[in-house]
Structures are given as C-alpha cells and as structure tokens.
Amino acid sequence: MASNIRIIFYGTGGSWPTPLRAMPGVGVKIDDVLNLFDCGEGTQKQIMKSSTSFMDIDNIFITHFHGDHFLGLLGLVQSMSFNNRTKQLNIFGPHGAIKILSNALNVGYYTLHFPLKIYELEPDRTYDLGKFLIRTMLNDHPVPALSYSIEERDLVRIDPEKAREKNIPSRIIEKIRENGSYVYKGNEYRIDDIAGGVRKGRRIVYTGDTRPMDRMIEFARNADVLIHDTTTDSSFEPMVNEFGHSSSRQAARIARQARVGRLYLYHYSPRITDTSVLLEDARKEFQETYESKDLMEYEVKVRRDVD
C-alpha cells in the first residue's frame, strides 16, 4: 500500500519574522510519521495553527545553524515536555549539531521528560529511517549546511492475476509485501512470484539556504517536489549569491534541468512583500513553479509510472 505523503509549509520567510511570514519550517508527514525540516522562531505556534500537532513530531532535520533555522527549537522542546511527551524525539543536523543543540537546549530551568537524541549527519550519505530514506548533500553557504532528500522506498506493484493463479488471499499478499516472502499453507511465496513491476518511490528535496549549484541538479534529479531557497527575484542575484542564497530564476533553472515535478519558492527575504515578481521570474524558466505560503499544504500524489 502506498504511503500518504503531505507537505505542510509552517513558515516560508527568512532572516527575521514579518507580519506576512513566519520563519522557516516545513513538515513532511509520511503516514503517521511527522518530520520537521528547520525550526525557526515561532514554529511551534505555526504548527498549532496547522492540521498537525507538535506532539506528533518524530524527527527534526536542521539544515544549518543560522538563527532563523533553529531558534524555535528551545521553545518547541520545552512545550513538548510541559505537555507530558514520552516518545523519543530525534534531531538531525550538520557538523556541529551535537555541541550547538546541547548548549541551546540546556538554557533555562526546565525538566526534559522524554528521550531526545541528537545526530550529526555527513554529506553525501543515505540514512535509513524505516519508512523512508534521507539523503544529504553539502550546500554552498557560508556555514556548514545540508540539503535533504526525503525518499519513499520503491513500491512493488502486485499483479492480481498472478496472485489469483496461486490462490493467495489479499491478507497474505500484504504480508508478502511487508516481509518479502511469507509461508502460507506450507508453501513459501516470494514477492517476485506475484510482482507486476516496481513503482518508483516519491522524492521531496528541501535545500535550505544555498547558492545555486550544479550539484543540486543531480541531487534533485526527477524529484516530485523541490523546495529551493528563493530569497529574492533576479534583480538582486549578485547580492543574494554573495550571502549564500539563490534567486527564484536560479532555482527555476535548477528545477528545469533536474526535471522535477514541481518547484516551490521558499525562504523569501523579509524585505519582499509581493512574491508575484519572484513567481513571474521563475516561470520564465520553469512553468511548474509555485509560491509557498505559510500554512499551505500539498499532498504528493503517487507516481503512475511502473518499471
């Protein structure tokens, strides 16, 4: 059975909060597993306004340690503790995560009532998180920063005719799918016995802050969704590139070359009030470009292509 995958844009601004936008924070919910990518100031309040609960967060992935991407963590963790959370929270980040986050989370007087684990991730690695994989890449930014690719496992499509020929009931088919094989009435059935092709898993790429990079084209290749740093429109490219960011036009070029399904503009400069200029710039390069907005949600549809 294919997973339900939903993206929730909690906050879409950058640098500092404005009346229009909250700080960076993106939820990716895969069935009942809620992942948070970046946690800027005020993220917990944005989550309260959304269809999700901050108590349900399983994993937090920080792209880098500029304040607008992680200063919301302390309040979020304390609120979880005040609300009697018991399940483990995993926080992932680039080099320096353990020292920086341990210091930040030890500020003030409060008691942590649940297990919290901090992990430092290496670039150019793939990590198995059970229902999905996380792939990392080093960004072009003034401090250590990672892009994340959230990858659903490939799904074997069951050929109902093959299953019918072998008299395998549907409840046993699911056990075969889950385990790769299953013994039923004394016979072992393998997934290959009833397979009708493989449906490629869906992929979401979240860049965090970065200058435009050729490596991003390959990293995001054929992703269903690319959420890319688009701090300004093309008229400010030299300035934003100098500070380690991208324009909407540059992000759209990457999206087009990577052949992604859709691009979401993200991490708008607080000086920008009208993002339609960024969208117009981007769509000259890549038509399937969309503005992200605070509290907007998008369901990532199951791929129809089967190998």
UniProtKB/Swiss-Prot annotation:
Organism: Thermoplasma acidophilum (strain ATCC 25905 / DSM 1728 / JCM 9062 / NBRC 15155 / AMRC-C165)
This protein's name: Ribonuclease Z
Catalytic residue list: 68 (proton acceptor)
Cofactor section: Zn(2+)
Protein family (similarity comment): Belongs to the RNase Z family.
Cofactor info, note text: Binds 2 Zn(2+) ions.
HAMAP family linked to this entry: RNase_Z_BN
Major enzyme class: hydrolase
Keyword tRNA processing (UniProt): yes
Free-text function comment from the UniProt entry: Zinc phosphodiesterase, which displays some tRNA 3'-processing endonuclease activity. Probably involved in tRNA maturation, by removing a 3'-trailer from precursor tRNA.
Molecular function in Gene Ontology: 3'-tRNA processing endoribonuclease activity; zinc ion binding
InterPro entries the record matches: Metallo-B-lactamas, RibonucZ/Hydroxyglut_hydro, RNase_Z/BN
Gene behind this protein: rnz
Keyword set, alphabetical order: Endonuclease, Hydrolase, Metal-binding, Nuclease, tRNA processing, Zinc
Phylogenetic classification of the source organism: Archaea, Methanobacteriati, Thermoplasmatota, Thermoplasmata, Thermoplasmatales
UniProt keyword Nuclease present: yes
Disulfide topology: none
Residues that bind Zn(2+) 2: 68-69, 209, 267
Subunit structure: Homodimer.
Catalytic activity: Endonucleolytic cleavage of RNA, removing extra 3' nucleotides from tRNA precursor, generating 3' termini of tRNAs. A 3'-hydroxy group is left at the tRNA terminus and a 5'-phosphoryl group is left at the trailer molecule
